[in-house]
């Protein structure tokens, strides 16, 4: 069996199936277990805690890496890059911010994989600026739906992605270009297991990692909002609740003004100030 140190570093060459099985054997952490481990790492520099955190999240890296299989790169390499992002996330994670590690780590995992794809998908880089990178990853999804673009479709894509039609044409041209020696020769991968079909299949049956990320982010946002509301005075808190959080009815400024014996304009001012305070508290 692959030991902990091996599974942390790189995907075992030619044995990706075994790696995935082992990664999935590691139990997922409860909230309390995760908090204890992240605090041990952050405040005591406990490397054993870091190792456990990384091992218990490898399954998420595997899942995320499958979403990038369409670029013709080995899944083992994508996983390796994702693992680097996971390690960076574990090192930077603050257990006091109130979100689960997986929510924080998704950004770092995707960021490392993005960089790897951009470095290796073409010998000549196709995306060097921030806007080009956004277009690169989104254009592949759009092209699966539309195929080759005509002028009208270029305009549609440009509007959808918030870029110019010129950028769309240029990126489509770059992505359609052929590179010399893009695919490695068979001699470079003598072991047939290295090119097993699992490395090129995208898992479309679930969206587990994104689902966990979304659920935890929504929980984090709700907790931040509740905490921010408690910082408001009682009247401001009631105004915000009545205007924005009451699902049963929409309270008008005048209705609230009548309850407090003030003008509707004064309620509007209080609401505006309260919203500013909430925004600052939530973004803090």
Swiss-Prot record:
CDD domains for the chain: Sigma70_r4
Chief site of localization: cytoplasm
Region feature (Sigma-70 factor domain-4): 228-280
Region Sigma-70 factor domain-2, annotated ranges: 53-122
Keyword ATP-binding: no
GO molecular function list: DNA binding; sigma factor activity
DNA-binding region: 253-272
Motif Interaction with polymerase core subunit RpoC mapped to chain: 77-80
Record keywords, A-Z: Cytoplasm, DNA-binding, Sigma factor, Stress response, Transcription, Transcription regulation
InterPro entries: RNA_pol_sigma-70_dom, RNA_pol_sigma70, RNA_pol_sigma70_r2, RNA_pol_sigma70_r4, RNA_pol_sigma_r2, RNA_pol_sigma_r3/r4-like, RNA_pol_sigma_RpoH_proteobac, Sigma-70_Factor
One Pfam family matching this protein: Sigma70_r4
One of the GO biological process terms: response to heat
One cellular-component annotation, GO: cytoplasm
Cited SUPFAM superfamilies: Sigma2 domain of RNA polymerase sigma factors, Sigma3 and sigma4 domains of RNA polymerase sigma factors
Keyword Cytoplasm: yes
Subcellular location: Cytoplasm
Family membership noted in the UniProt record: Belongs to the sigma-70 factor family. RpoH subfamily.
Known role: Sigma factors are initiation factors that promote the attachment of RNA polymerase to specific initiation sites and are then released. This sigma factor is involved in regulation of expression of heat shock genes.
Complex and partners: Interacts with the RNA polymerase core enzyme.
Record protein name field: RNA polymerase sigma factor RpoH
Gene symbol of the encoding locus: rpoH
């Amino acid at each position: 069996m692959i030991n902990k140190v091996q599974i942390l570093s790189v995907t075992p060459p030619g044995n990706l199936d075994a790696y995935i099985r082992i990664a999935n054997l590691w139990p997922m952490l409860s909230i309390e277990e995760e908090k204890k481990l992240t605090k041990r790492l952050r405040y005591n520099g406990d490397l054993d805690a870091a190792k456990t955190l990384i091992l218990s999240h490898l399954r998420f890296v595997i899942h995320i890496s499958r979403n990038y299989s369409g670029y013709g790169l080995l899944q083992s390499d994508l996983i390796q890059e994702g693992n680097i992002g996971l390690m960076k996330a574990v090192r930077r994670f603050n257990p006091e911010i109130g979100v689960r590690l997986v929510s924080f780590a998704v950004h770092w995992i995707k960021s490392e994989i993005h960089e790897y794809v951009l470095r290796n998908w073409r010998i000549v880089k196709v995306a060097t600026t921030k806007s080009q990178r956004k277009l690169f990853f989104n254009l592949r999804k759009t092209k699966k739906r539309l195929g080759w673009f005509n002028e009208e479709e270029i305009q549609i894509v440009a509007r959808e992605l918030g870029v110019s039609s010129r950028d769309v044409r240029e990126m489509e041209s770059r992505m359609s270009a052929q590179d010399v020696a893009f695919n490695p020769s068979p001699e470079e991968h003598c072991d047939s297991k290295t090119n097993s079909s699992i490395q090129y299949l995208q898992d479309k049956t679930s969206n587990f990692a994104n689902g966990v990320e979304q659920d935890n982010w929504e929980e984090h946002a709700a907790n931040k909002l509740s905490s921010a509301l408690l910082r408001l005075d009682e009247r401001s808190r009631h105004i915000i609740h009545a205007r924005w959080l009451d699902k049963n009815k929409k309270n008008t400024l005048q209705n609230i003004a009548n309850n407090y014996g003030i003008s509707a304009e004064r309620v509007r001012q209080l609401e505006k100030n309260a919203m500013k305070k909430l925004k600052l508290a939530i973004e803090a």
